[in-house]
Structures are given as C-alpha cells and as structure tokens.
C-alpha cells in the first residue's frame, strides 16, 4: 500500500525493479544505463568515489539480483525468518563482480530486544508479538504498548505463531543476545550482522542498543 501511494498511479511495477537497480548502478558509476532514453541522464553532485549501492531483500529473487549485479546483500531475516543459510549460499555461488565490489558480502538483519534481565526483554518484545498478529490479520495499526499486549487474549493458534517467531529472534540479556547473534554469524557464514529493535517506548529501544553495543565483541 505504501509503495502504491508513493507511485501515484504509475504503471511501473516490481517487474521493472531489476532494470531500475542496474540503471541506478550505471548512473552512479557514470556508465551507459540499460533503459533506452536514459543515456543522457547524469547523477549529481559528481564525486570522486560513487556511493555504495546495497541490496536489501527478503526473498531469493533479491538474492539472485544482488549476485547478478555484483552488489553486497543484506537479507531481512526479521521479515522472512523461514529462509535459512541457503539464501547466502546461492548468492555466493552466483556472484558476479560488479563495478564496485569484486567479491560477495553477506549481511543478516535480525530483530533483537536487549534488557538487563531476560524477563524484561521478553516483556518489551510482547509489543511486537501483538503487532505481528495484527499484521497477519491485515490490521497492524500503531505499535501497541506492553500493557496492551499483556491484556490481549491470544488464541492457541496465535500463541503458537508467536512462539515459532520468537525462536528466530535475539531477545534477552546482553550475553544471551550476543550468543544468539554469534550463532547466526556461524550458521549463515556472515560478514556482518545488523540488528533491528522496535519497542513501544523509545527509551527502551535506545537502551537496548546501548546494552548490546557495550556487550558485543
């Protein structure tokens, strides 16, 4: 819905995305774009070193495009936690050196909540649990408070969905979160790991990042 609102009725859909990526890559490197009519387009301001272009995705399609275009790949595990290490294995096997990167570069973005105690971290994460259930029902709305999530009457099916998703996140004390992140680095053979923390209270979110920053090696 957001993408449609931004396009304002444009007929350019996701099927054009691969060409858009390659055209942008060409414009940033001052080389001829693929799309006819763009050969006279220029990217400004001009710089000595073009900005790095990365691919963020949550499917095998984006992984394949990143490999073909020679781009570093950031997989949004917080969006699609059902895909495993094979997403990067395929990316590495099919990687073709591009104008800015000669070798593949793998990053995984994971949902995390870090607090002084595991109990507090789990309580903070309940806001996202409820938000996710509402998202599945087609009505995500504003991010709920911890109290709102605690008062919600979950069905047995919803409880199972939450439990399954929680296994794929890094939630707990700084030590527990670091241990979980280390396991992701090993299992996915990562070059980098990126974390995403969303809480109802912005102070708790900031503190989560601070705790993890201090503990992460």
Give, region by region, the residue ranges found by the protein language model.
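Hydrophobic faces of well-ordered beta-strands that scaffold small-molecule active sites
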Residues: 52-56, 73-76, 104-111, 193-195
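Generic C-terminus detector
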Residues: 179, 185-217
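Active-site mouth loops of central-metabolism enzymes
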Residues: 47-57, 165-174
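An alpha-helical appendage that flanks or caps ligand/catalytic pockets
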Residues: 4, 8-42, 83-188
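A conserved active-site cap/scaffold subdomain adjacent to cofactor or substrate pockets
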Residues: 59-82, 87-88, 92
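Short aromatic-enriched loop/helix-cap "lid" or pocket-rim segments at secondary-structure transitions
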Residues: 1-5, 67, 208
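Active-site-proximal loop/turn and secondary-structure-junction residues that shape catalytic pockets
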Residues: 79, 112-114, 199
